[in-house]
């Protein structure tokens, strides 16, 4: 049995801690056998191989009676780069617990569990449900609604440096003045409306109009504005900081991808790039 979990791109500019989309990079967890102890085989530096691994830790949180398993992990999702790697591990752990504990969890219950662990639904909801998802938390209950899937290619520019979410949050202000907060909220509200009505020209403009986090984080990811400038020249829909960064994500029509990549190269932007697409399925079990 293999659990296949997509990566995710979150915030989409002003949809801070609320909007996210599953994308076509994957974490795969293969169950090799029952064992006398938890063993997680992988080649990722500084990630535990025992029950302290986030996948196993999550599974045991959901189902403490889980029998020890020998697992093999294949991961294509860059860690600490704003592509939801921790949410993907958490989703895999929930699925592991649900399957072997015979819990019969619904997708909605899985989202509740994952969002409680994460603290917000922007990555975990699309990772579980697939597609583009808008979510929030009210009175410790998480709501998530799927929007239409955008018809674009995604180009993820992944700088060589990591940027942990906790470090990226340190640069955010503790408070926003009322005028800024209401303006930011109006931008986010209109972004949601444009995504659901598939008005992507408007959505692109709004994705690049955030006041909640990008103005404070752009100094941590200096490539953001450079890439956005190239993207505008190459007819892209929008460019934004994926999650907390350091990945910069661009929505673009497939016919313009080659020119965009060439433009990045000409501007000396030569870090790894991934050509991705929205993932509509979310977490899957492959028998």
From Swiss-Prot:
GO terms for molecular function: ATP binding; homoserine kinase activity. Pathway: Amino-acid biosynthesis; L-threonine biosynthesis; L-threonine from L-aspartate: step 4/5. The gene is thrB. It is an enzyme of class 2 (transferase). It comes from Lactobacillus acidophilus (strain ATCC 700396 / NCK56 / N2 / NCFM). GO terms for cellular component: cytoplasm. Catalyzes the ATP-dependent phosphorylation of L-homoserine to L-homoserine phosphate. InterPro entries: GHMP_kinase_C_dom (IPR013750), GHMP_kinase_C_sf (IPR036554), GHMP_kinase_N_dom (IPR006204), GHMP_knse_ATP-bd_CS (IPR006203), Homoserine_kinase (IPR000870), Ribosomal_Su5_D2-typ_SF (IPR020568), Ribsml_uS5_D2-typ_fold_subgr (IPR014721). Belongs to the GHMP kinase family. Homoserine kinase subfamily. This is Homoserine kinase. It catalyses: L-homoserine + ATP = O-phospho-L-homoserine + ADP + H(+). Keywords: Amino-acid biosynthesis, ATP-binding, Cytoplasm, Kinase, Nucleotide-binding, Threonine biosynthesis, Transferase. It holds the Pfam family GHMP_kinases_C. ATP binds at residues 78-88. Gene3D superfamilies: 3.30.230.10, GHMP kinase, C-terminal domain. Its main location: cytoplasm. It comes from the Bacteria. It is found in: Cytoplasm. HAMAP family: Homoser_kinase. Its EC number is 2.7.1.39. One of its GO terms (biological process) is threonine biosynthetic process.
